[in-house]
Amino acid sequence: MADKQRKKVILVGDGAVGSSYAFALVNQGIAQELGIVDLFKEKTQGDAEDLSHALAFTSPKKIYSADYSDASDADLVVLTSGAPQKPGETRLDLVEKNLRITKDVVTKIVASGFKGIFLVAANPVDILTYATWKFSGFPKNRVVGSGTSLDTARFRQALAEKVDVDARSIHAYIMGEHGDSEFAVWSHANVAGVKLEQWFQENDYLNEAEIVELFESVRDAAYSIIAKKGATFYGVAVALARITKAILDDEHAVLPVSVFQDGQYGVSDCYLGQPAVVGAEGVVNPIHIPLNDAEMQKMEASGAQLKAIIDEAFAKEEFASAVKN
């Protein structure tokens, strides 16, 4: 699908995240066609018109207000539609209302004849990625979530500011849920092959308490931003653009995305954030980082928490009746 000369993306959800993602695609010259779908048709028309005025500064692209039927020949459908996270609300608080939205959207996309890749960003992203897989009947690899891509970027940036190294040169991951049960994989965090734990000791950068504080600032970043400005959207939009480029260009890039779990970390039948090779077929190959005992326990706990919520939600007839996988 993604090796056609004209690469087509359909975006469903033209809120703060969706419109920021569309702007990121225009800015970076990603895709040659972008259709925007939302309940508020005039908003999509206005955004398409506004974005088109930036094309003379970037690269040619067809941008338009789309309908679900336009997904029939798309390479990628990106789902940002859903109720936003409010101040004081966790991502998991959004489950039922966003499951209903996801079921409706995915059903309509599949009915169009769409055969490409789903990229899910609406929260709680791991659960909604799982739901997209269940409602679509698609193979696991062709349903991808943004996962811990943003959390990992936040982690690398926070570390970069502490150790005075370009964030792009820091190799470190956040894994698990995109949410409160996520964890930092300190056992593999490194700069130029030097473990960060050793780097901290040799350069007297961070003590144990400061390391904990740094991780907590990463984990709780969304709450801080939401309290100040009502929503997070720029960071996740650029993360989505990066994943989009990897898929459309068949890059085989290693990115921390939401991947189906088949027991590799003691977790099964759910999606969780972990590094994976990403290309034209979606998840080409999950990368199973060998975790230490403490990290493995955190991964299992994160998966168990999400699985319990999934099982409770899909026990309800309105969701169980729509399952295709």
Swiss-Prot record:
Matching Pfam families: Ldh_1_C (PF02866), Ldh_1_N (PF00056)
GO molecular function, one term: L-lactate dehydrogenase activity
GO annotations of cellular component type: cytoplasm
Binding site for substrate: 85, 91, 123-126, 151-154, 232
Cell compartments where the protein resides: Cytoplasm
Broad enzyme group: oxidoreductase
Sites of Phosphotyrosine modification: 223
Residues forming the catalytic site: 178 (proton acceptor)
Catalytic activity, EC: 1.1.1.27
Keywords for this protein: Allosteric enzyme, Cytoplasm, NAD, Oxidoreductase, Phosphoprotein
Binding, beta-D-fructose 1,6-bisphosphate: 156, 171
Highest taxon in the source lineage: Bacteria
Pathway note: Fermentation; pyruvate fermentation to lactate; (S)-lactate from pyruvate: step 1/1
Gene Ontology annotations of biological process type: glycolytic process; lactate metabolic process
PANTHER family, A to Z: L-2-HYDROXYCARBOXYLATE DEHYDROGENASE (NAD(P)(+)) (PTHR43128), L-LACTATE DEHYDROGENASE (PTHR43128:SF16)
Family: Belongs to the LDH/MDH superfamily. LDH family.
Subunit architecture: Homotetramer.
Matching NCBIfam families: L-LDH-NAD (TIGR01771), PRK00066.1 (NF000824)
HAMAP family given in the database record: Lactate_dehydrog (MF_00488)
Protein's name according to its UniProt entry: L-lactate dehydrogenase 1
The species this protein was found in: Lactococcus lactis subsp. lactis (strain IL1403) (Streptococcus lactis)
